[in-house]
Every structure is written in C-alpha cells, then in structure tokens.
C-alpha cells in the first residue's frame, strides 16, 4: 500500500475482502463454531434434563479451544499471495526486527463469566482475539488490546503460541487491521463474533434489519481498492513484464477464495477479461478498468441479496410469532439454515426459562461490553490514525535516510575524487612554482639583456652621430685628396713624357752601338792584319798577347752558348788588368777593342733570343712529329711483313733503334741548349735586378735625407708657434685632429682586414711558390718606386708599416733568388705584365687571378707578392716553450749573400700595401741585423709624412697625427703576430724547429717600429721592442716620439668602440719640457739616418730567443727607470698594455692548459714508444743477421758495434726527453718571471698615479674650501643643489667611466681615459659638494679612470676606480672648519688602506692566474669549435700553439 493514500471507510472492495477472509477461516478452522450442537439427554423422553449442561459444555468447548487456526488464518491473511493452510507459517524464514516489516497483532479478551479482572487471570472463560496490524499503537488504559509483534519466536510458551509469519514483500505494506464486533448476535458467548459478521456481510443471513447500518458503522477497512488490484496484478506478474495472462488472474482469485470454476462471479470476470477464450495477456490499465467494472457488478448483486435477506427475516418473525417459544424456533431455524438437524427431544419449559434468563443476562452484559468495545474501537481508530500519520512520517524519514545514505556515498566518492584532484593540483602547483621561478630567472635575464641592449642602443646612437661627423670630415678630406690626385696626375704626365724621351735616347744609343760594332769589325780586321805582321816580325814576343784574341775567336766559334759569354763578361776587368800587368807592351788600341768586344759579347738582344727560342721549340715539335710518323710506319711495316719476311725483321729493328737513338741524342742536345738559354737569361735578369735595386736605394736615401731636413724645419716652426699660442687654444685645437685621425683609421681598417683574410684563403699551396716570382718582382721595382712616390703624395699620413712591409718583401724576394731554381722567359714576362697592368686601387682578387705559365707548361694563377709570406720559416706558430732554433738553409744563405737594403723601406702603394699585409712578410726583416737603427728610420719617415701636411698650413693637426702614429707604433707587433697565429693554424702545421723559430723572429720584427693606421687589421697591442747591440737606443727612439705627443694621448680601446676621447689637460709649465723632448728627438732621428747609411753594407745576423728575452728585460728596465714626471708616460702605458695582454694570455693558457698537457704527454709517449719499437726491430734484424755473418769476423764486429750504438741511442733518447722537459720548464719559469716583473711594475705605476692624483685632489680641495665656506649659510640653496646632484653625478660618471668589454677588439691597449677639466662641471661639483647626507655615495672626481674588462664593474674603493672620499667630505661645514689637522691624518690613513687593498687585489689576481685550475678546452671532435675559439680569443692574446689538437 502506498504511504500517501489515506484509508476510506466505505470501500467497495470490503465485501471481497470479507469473503476472502471468511473462506480462509472456514477452510482453516478444524472445529467450526457453526457446527450444529448435539444435545445429549439421559433419556429420549426427557430431553430437557441435560440442556443446561450441554449448553455450558458447548460454550466451554468453544471458549477454551486453542487459537492455532486463528494464528494460521492471521498468517494467511497477511498477503494475498500467501498459500492457505495451517502449515504455511511454520517453514517461513525469520526476518530481522525492523520497523519496515514489523507486524503487530491486536489481542482482545472477551469474557463471559466474571469481571474484567477475573478474565485477565482466567484462561478458561476467555479467548484471545487477534487481528493483524502493521502500525504500532499506544496501549489504552483498559487493557482490552495487546500489541504483540508478529516476529516473536516460538519460545514464548504454549499459552501464547504466536508463530512468525511470512515476510512481506519490501515496499508492499499491508494494513489488515479490521475491527469487527457483533452487537446483534444473541449467542454472545460464541468466540467468533467477527466470523458471524463476515458471513452476514456476504449475504448468508441476518437476523435484524438494523445490522447493515451497524455493520457499516463498526467495521473499518484499511485496504484500498486500487491497492488490492495492484497487489493481485503484481502477484500474477512474476516476470515483471507489465502484462499478465487472464488465466493467471482467474486462477489466483479461485485459489485465494477457494471457489469452484463454476462460480458465477469468477465466470463473469473471466468472460469480461477474455471474451474469446484465447487466454490473452492484458496490461495494468486494462486490468484496472475491467476489475472495477466487475466490482460494481458484484455490489449491485449484494444489494439484491440484502433485500432477499430482509424478506426472509420478516417471514421468520411471522413463524416465530406463531410458535410458543421464539427462542426455540429461532434456534431451530438457525440450525436448519446451517444444515443441522433439529433436536427431536422436547425441552422442558423450566430449563428453557433458565436458559432464556441466563441468555438475557448475558446479553445485557455483552451489550455493555460491546458499548465499551465501541468506545475502545473509537479510541483505537484515533490512535490508529495517529499511528498512520507517524508511520508516514517515519517512512518519509526512512526515505530521507536512504537519500542521505546515497548522498553520503556520493560525498565519499566526491571526497576521493577531491583527494585525487588535490594531489594533482599539488603537483601542478609545484610545477607552476618551478615554472614561475624559471620565468622569474628568465625575466631577470631578459631585463638585464634589455638594459644591455638599451646601453648598446645609446652607444650605437652616439656612434652614429660620430660617424656622421666623421663622414663629413671624410667628405672634406676626400675633396682635398681629389685636388691632390689631379696635381699628381699632372706630375705623372710630366714623368711619362720624360720616360718617353729617355726611351728615344735609348733607341738612339742602340743605333750608335750598331754603328760602333760595324766600326769595330773593321778595326778588328785591321788588328788581325797587324797581328799577322807582328807575328812575322817578332814571333816570340807576341805569344802572350794572343790569349785575348784567341779567347775572342773561341767565343766566336763556340756553339753560341749565352752562359759562356756571360761568364766571360762578368770578369772582364780582371782579365784586362792581368793582361795589362803581364803584357806591358800590348797596345792601348788592342785593350780598347777587346773591351768593346767583350761588352758586345754579352749576348744577342732579347728579340733575337726569343726568335731562336721559338725556332728551336718549333724544330723540336716538327722532329717529334716526324719521329712519331716514322715509328708508326716502321711498326706497321713490321706487322704487315712479319709473315713473309721473318729473316729481315731483326735487321729492321736494329736500324729503327739506331734511328731512334740518334733522334734522342738530338733532342737531348736541343734541351741542353734550352737550359743554357734559360740559365743565361736568369743571370742577366739577376744582374739587372741588382742594378735596379742599387738605383732605388740611392733614390730612397736622397728622398729620406731631403724629407728629414724639411721635417725638422717644419717641426721647429711648429714648436715656436705652439709656445706662442696660449694654453686654452692649444687644448681646443688638440681635440679635433685625433678625432679625424681616428675616423680615417676606423674606416680604412676593416676593408684592408677583409682583403688580408681573403688573400690568405685564396693563396695556393706552398709548393707552387716559384723562384721566378722574386726575380720578376725585382724587375717591377722601378714601377713600384713611381707608384710609391705617387701614393706618398696622395696620403701624407701613411706610416712606416706599409713601406717597411713592401721593402722587406722585395728584399726577401731578392734574397730568395740566390738558391732557387730557374724558370723560362715567357712566364717571367707574363708575370711582369700582370703586375705592371695593375692600377693603384686594383683589388687583391684580380691580382691573384692573373694567369701565367709555370715550369711544366701548365697554367696556374699568378699570385701576388704575398707568396713568400706563406713560407713556413716565417709563419710557423709559436712553440709552447719558445726555444731558440737555428735558421733553415734559406734564411742563412739569403742572409749571408744579400747586402743590407733597409733604405728601401720607404716606398709603397695602396696596391702593394694590400698585397703585403700578411704579417709574415714583416718577418723577412729579421734576416738583417737589428743594429741598423731601423726604428729611427721609422721616426724619420713619420716626420716626413707630417711635413706634407704641415706645408698646407695645418701644424696642429700634423702634430697630433704624429702622436697618433707613434702611439700606434708601440702596439702593432703583437697584433700582427696574433694574426699570424690565428691564420697559420688554419693553413698548415709546421715542424717544431720552424715553430720555435717564429717567435724570436717576430720579436725582432717589432723592433722595426712598424705602424699602420689600420688598427683593425694589425691589432692594437704594444710591441716589445728588442735589439741586439743598441736596444737602449731603440727604446729611447720609441719613447721620444711618444713623449712628444703625451698631451694628446688617446685610448685605442675607446677608438675601437667609437667612444670619443678628449686629450688630457697638462699644466703650462710642462710645455717647454715637451718642446725640448721633441727637439732632442729630431736631432737623434737625423743621427740615426747617418748611422744607418754607415751600416748599410754590414752583414745581417739572426737574433736568437735569448737575445730577444734580454732585449725585453732591458726594455722593461728602461721603462721602469724612466722619469716619473708624467704618470701616463709611454712606458707606463706600455706596461699597462702588457699587463692586460699577459692577464688575458694567462687566462687563455689556463683555458687550454689541461688539454694541451694531455696532448703533449700523449705525443711524447707515442714518440718514445715509436723509437723504442724501432730500436727493438733493429735489434731483431741484427739478431737475424748474426747467423749469416758468423764466419765473417769483420761483419760480426760491425754488428756488435751497431748493437752498442742502439743501446746508447736509447739512453740518449731518454736523456734528451728529460732535458727537453727541463728546458721547457725553465722557459716557462722565465716567462712567468717576466710576467711577474711586468705586473709589479704595473702596480708601481698605479701607486704613483694614485699618489699624484690624490695630491692634485688635495690641492684642488684646499683651493675650493674658502669658496665652500662662503656658501655655508645658504641652506636652502644647498638643498636645491643637492636635488640636482644625482643627475649631474650620473651624467659625469657616464661620461667618465666607460667600461670596455671582457674581450675588447684591442686587448692589451691603453685603458686610460683622459678626461678634460671642464669648468662647468667643476662649478657644479663645487656648489653641490656640501650635502651632508648624500656625500657618502659620491666620489671625488678624478681626471682619469683605469678600467679593464675584469674590473670595470667593481665598485670598490680601489685604484682601478677612484679613491674613497675622505671623512671631511661627510662632515658638516661647522665641523670641517674646526678640524683640518684631524682630517688630513685620516686622509693619510685612507690612502694607505686603499694602497693595501689594491696590492691585495693584484696579488690575488696574480695568484688566480698562476694557480687557476685547468679547464678543458672546447670540444675538439670537429674543427669548427676549436677554430672559433682561436678566432675569437687568440688573435687578441698573442698565443700561438700547435694548431688544433689531434682527435
């Protein structure tokens, strides 16, 4: 039953329920209460004697009967599906006690005898009345009803034998509580009042007309019609299909009501459900409709039955009224109606009276009890209603509990999911935190990059502005140069006209020579006649005089060998002198004629030689073709006639061999003649080259002398003008020329550097270098002289390095010709043409691609003058130990044979400069002695180039240009060596001796004072000036030009980075000293020129490593002992540049130290192992030779000696290895000692500079103190100035402290910044210095800051930045006036503290450089990364190792 449905009192299905219950009781009751009683009597005649007894017995019997059947019927009434029968409840399972399936039984005790209290204790006259109730109810006070759960067990005892019922289906609650009472039954003592009521309700009989009304008021049915129909349908629908067969429904109703199949009601229902008798299945809606219709039909039949019952009752009353005893008739009629037999005995009247009296009394009692029961029933109905409501509430709570349980399960699942999601969220949070940290780091790095980019952007903007200015300057300069070019073109036109005139004169002279030769022939014929006459006259005396004429005749009758003629022509004077001394009576006419003849015998003209050469080659080709044809015809004839003429074959073969041998001898003779032609031509060319070199040297000497004189005059005039001009004008004018020079250098450098690298990559292998190139270059020397003079006039600021390069190159070329092979004439002419056709600005690639024919006839590219630059003796990288090694054969021979020609260093051109930028071309200059005073030549040439500018009325610019050139002169050599190192590693790996030789030669080169404006190309590092005999003079010659321009020193690193620099300010009292230094320098340069001319013919010497080291130490000593009047003198700058170079060099050394150590150890071990294996193999071979030479004692002795020699060789090898390692360690120790010396000197220089600047600061502060006190009272003005102080400080520090990169473009250059003492800045500092709170973070201004790549960003109070401000800066004005002595004492303390800090920092740096742990180099699996390291780092450090280490 659904919880929400409320019971109705008048339910149309009540009749069906009552019928079903009555039928169940009728079947279950064994002793039916409706059995007809059998009255027993003592005799048949007197039936009234036992009536009382029989009635009492019957009442007792029906009262004391146990209620088993009632329990069974109660069990059967629980659900319609329960099977009827007394045993249906015995085997049912027991269910747990739950509020859902709990069923309560309401027990009512009805007693006939005694009071209510007696009935409670007496079981004889009372019988329990039980009905099922599934709703608990509170017990009333009269204790008429007991509520006993249906789930009580069997152990309750025999008196209350209540058995467990069948558990109802969950969700189906049957409320079977039916309260029934019989208030109209006269037999009140019967124990089944409800059964009587139900039978009457079925229409089986009623005694009174008031029964239906009372019955409808008393009975309450709680079963709903629809719920009952649903229950029946669900019971029949066992498979839960939603449809039930009609036969199942009819069988269920038949079985439940125990009716037969012929019952009219079931038959009618079957017809209604299945009219066609096909046993169809119907759904729930159809079932409901038909069943409701059938129930209505049954109700209508029930009304008819009630009417029939009333009619029968009236008839019965009539019959009873006719008889005497209504009771008897009533009893009889009742018994007959139930099918019993009427008693035949005649009862006595007295007994009947007694019975009637008892019955009336009992009836009254029962009526009272019925009234009480009605009241109890009403109370129970109210209670039942309350219980129903409470039950509904409990069911709603149960449903809510179930929902809560489901919700709890869902919540648990959600909690598990939340835990999983929480763990995942924790992981994601950890990942997000890691990502956030990573993003923060990246953000910081990006911020730093953005800041760096902003700084770079500012620098680029500044550079762009500067470049714009430089472009404007260059435009002006270009205009001037164009004017000069036009003037030079006019000069060239004049010179070409002169050359043409000279050519005409030469032609005339040739014609005259021809005429003279004809005259000489005539004279020789006369001479022959005279000789013949003399022989006839004096035959004995004329024999000695015949030698010359005989030689002449032999020369005439010879095979025309040019070599023999040239050999005789080279020593004509000696022969003539010998003849003149030995044959004193020879005539002067003979001597003159013989001299002319010998001169004419020097050979035919080049045109004749070329014609003979061509004719000889054509003849050889023709003979070759003829020989080939004859050979082929002979072979063909032999093959054709081999079958027929076998006998003549041998003869023909011999004849052919003879012919071929003759032809071969002819060819050999012709080839020998060609060799003679070539040799004679080579000698002639060599002679011409030597003559031309001599003439060029004389021209250069004269030009140098003239230029030096003009330069000296111009410098003297400049000195006088400079002394007359005031100081401020000099400062203003000293800013521009350096700037202009810097523009020229920066714009010229990269293009030349590119040309240099391109030439290196395009150069052919070393084996293709031919000796003919040097000879032909000597032929081109006159053309080079003209081009060099022209270029000098165009570019007056060109310095010594270009001239020195081309001269050293040409000299090395001339030297190399003495031990080289010979070449033909045609390739020489082609090479000459390829050089002379090149214009001044011709690119390097064009000159490289000019073809010429080589020795073997193949065509190969005509290389420029740089071919000699690739010689291994000059380009080998520096060995790790810098050992001294002797020069190879080429160097020694060239050095011994060739005279000194350093005066040739002047001339060059742009083309030659581009072609000779390889640094090894400079190394050729090492072949000559450094004692020739070459640095002075460089100074004089620089002065001569200054003179050209001075003539245009620009003395100030010329002076500054000279200073820039001299300062660049000091930093050139190391950069060139770096270029050699970085590029030679790419091309070739050289033997150890050549590598060891490279460094001392390079050190000697730097003594030549090489300088070039192309600082990008050649590097901006200081060179270590070395010398053999006069190293001190060389150092002085380098110092003096730099002292001349020390006021205008600028930072090469700053110029590299396009940072504008301003010359430092010098006091006026030092100007006379500078002028005297300049004058002294000019005088020394003139002396050096004369000394160079005197030493021109001296023999060159090769300086070894020890000499180079000695010169380095002597130079350092001279620098350290130099006068300290200027703290930034050239020696200090050199030391500082050397310090930076060494520091970076040590860093790079440590970068590859461990890798190189392992490689060297591995190579050493491999070499020793190889030597050991060779010795072992030699011993094995000797052991194999011993059995074969046992008989020969001399051989055995030799073998034993060889074995002893092998043992000695092994020992010597071990000794050599150990000694070489010791020597390398000593070399390294020497290098470290020099480095420490340089660093100590650098520290001393820094200390002196700091002391000097600190003294200047103290002096400036004392001068500014009175002015500061005058402003002490204006506090508001101080506040205003202090607000502006930060921006001014930022601007000033930005303008001063310019930090260069860690590896700038010119490492090792000067890192001093010379700042001007601007009056506006000084005034701002003086006015804003009084802030007491802001002074702690402010530095006193310095005129110079020393910042390197390592220390640029350190903001410590060391000497690399500015000294710490004194305590007086922080004191208020009132205290400053009162304690000057105390502040000075504290100042001294601070000075010493700063000095100690600087020394500690430098010592720590030195220790880190010396003891730094080794770091592996870049991966060397492929060559790219190693080459990248070399290209980036080593060109700036001067390091030269053995190239890329082997894998």
From Swiss-Prot:
Residues 1410-1447 are lumenal. Residues 1388-1447 are annotated as: Necessary for nuclear membrane localization. Residues 800-812, 1037-1049, 1080-1096, 1120-1132 have a biased composition (Basic and acidic residues). Residues 420-436 have a biased composition (Low complexity). It is found in: Endoplasmic reticulum membrane; Nucleus envelope; Cytoplasm, Cytoskeleton, Microtubule organizing center, Centrosome; Cytoplasm, Cytoskeleton, Spindle pole. Residues 64-96, 420-439, 790-828, 841-860, 991-1132, 1267-1289, 1355-1379 are annotated as: Disordered. Residues 71-92, 1021-1035, 1110-1119, 1359-1371 have a biased composition (Polar residues). A maternally expressed membrane and cytoskeletal linker protein, which is essential for attachment of the centrosome to the male pronucleus. Promotes male and female pronucleus congression and subsequent fusion after fertilization. Congression is mediated by the sperm aster microtubules. This is Inositol 1,4,5-triphosphate receptor associated 2. It comes from Danio rerio (Zebrafish).
